[in-house]
Amino acid sequence: MTTSIIERIDAWAEKTPDFPCYEYAGTRLSYKELKRQSDALGSYLLKNLKTDKEKPIIVYGHMSPLMIIAFLGAIKSGRAYVPVDFSMPVERIEQIKKAADPALFICTEELPENLTITDCPVLNAENLVDALEKHFDEKPDPTSCVKNDDNYYIIYTSGSTGNPKGVQISQNNLVSFSNWILQDFSLQQGLRFLNQAPFSFDLSVMDLYPCLLSGGTLVPMDKTITSNLKDLYHEIPAQSFDVWVSTPSFADLCLLDPNFNQENNPNLTRFLFCGEVLAKKTARELLVRFPDAVIYNTYGPTEATVAVTQVRITAELIDAYPSLPLGVIKPDMRLHIIDQETGDVLPDGEKGEIVLIGASVSKGYLNEPEKTDQVFFDYKGYQAYHTGDSGIIKDGYLFFQGRLDFQIKLHGYRIELEDIENNLKKVSLIQNCAIIPKMKDGKVDMLVAQVIPSPNDFTKEYQLSAAIKNELKEFMPTYMIPRKWIYKTEFPLTMNGKIDRKALNQEVNK
């Protein structure tokens, strides 16, 4: 059982000093070097930063080894870090800087030319490397390290007002999450982990910390690789992954390659999915292609430290339910389904809002007390969070029922878009899909289905559409069937590896 993230990671510098903790673009970082360089940075920060330790450190960059050195260096100086990926627009970076009010801006890559930082000290990449060299072999005071309920990291998520919200995750939150992942998912020492998500997306926490805590090797697939399918399909088998952590959409992208299978990836025996709904088709295809692998579906919002439920996906489970379960809650958490109107806890089998209670729940949004009070609350002495997700419990499993705010009204009918997508994914002719409402005069005019079709013998798109509609009529009411159909070979993905619904929406609502 881990009680201190830093102590456990640093211990590998003694046990396996030369083992690589990180491999990126031909460079290897050993556990010994990770400790030495993060110690050096921690010492530098303790000597040079005199502002309040409540102020976090922004770490800007992408996937270079300097990113995790900066993360751990910040922690050793007693400050939380805020990861900011270099793919973020300048306006977004400025919003995060303003909201976080950081003590320092560490840059592992060059800042955009049109971004000027004047009200906060900046440590650029050149000066960062210089600081690491000058403080070679210095060790920070271990009592200065982030501990217990101190903030460990702060990740900014989209806010309904357009301004990002900083979710505060403490050392205790991360310890709870990490112990659960390492135990329930049987992650042994020395495994190679895929890092698909940028560090500004909390899915990355699911590979970064379980990897470092178990003495493994983190192997990032950066934007230059994931944006080029030919490079991606070549790189995956070359990296000999043991553990796959990604969104389902990223796996769907890889499944387009017929060579993505056990034969070409013999070590790949664990798939961990989070961040999106895992479709039955995706899970079934992975079980066929990777007979030696175990597949886990997980669920959790950023506000509850990445994930709080898990279930191992089997062929029997796929056949047993209309959609895949999200699993069972982790041992130190409680999950309630509540009536959104009355707040009453609902019995199993009734649909309501998912409320999470316990050790994984964040203390709230940084410097946002009003927004915090809207969704976080105390439940019998435990921190609790209104997820805004709709769910139902059947046979002890949690099932996702869509977002409470992802409903539309069409011709008087209240419709959940995820409900339509889940039904479309049952159709044999559909591999993946996204439903986009077409707007007219401020209201929904019709539903547009963007579809990646399964291989078929139709020569005309209208023939394919007719066949899909005919199959849909068996289990979906007519008013829910999309009126327009757009066919694609692949979907655009966000930097986090999710379907880029904003881009699809712009395409439909030009």
Curated annotation (Swiss-Prot):
Its main location: cytoplasm. It is found in: Cytoplasm. GO terms for cellular component: cytoplasm. D-alanine binds at residues 202, 306, 498. It comes from the Bacteria. InterPro entries: AA_adenyl_dom, AMP-bd_C, AMP-bd_C_sf, AMP-binding_CS, AMP-dep_synth/lig_dom, ANL_N_sf, DltA, DltA-like. Pfam families: AMP-binding, AMP-binding_C. Its EC number is 6.2.1.54. Keywords: ATP-binding, Cytoplasm, Ligase, Nucleotide-binding. It is an enzyme of class 6 (ligase). ATP binds at residues 157-158, 297-302, 389, 498. The keyword Cytoplasm applies. GO terms for molecular function: ATP binding; D-alanine [D-alanyl carrier protein] ligase activity. Belongs to the ATP-dependent AMP-binding enzyme family. DltA subfamily. HAMAP family: DltA (MF_00593). This is D-alanine--D-alanyl carrier protein ligase. The gene is dltA.
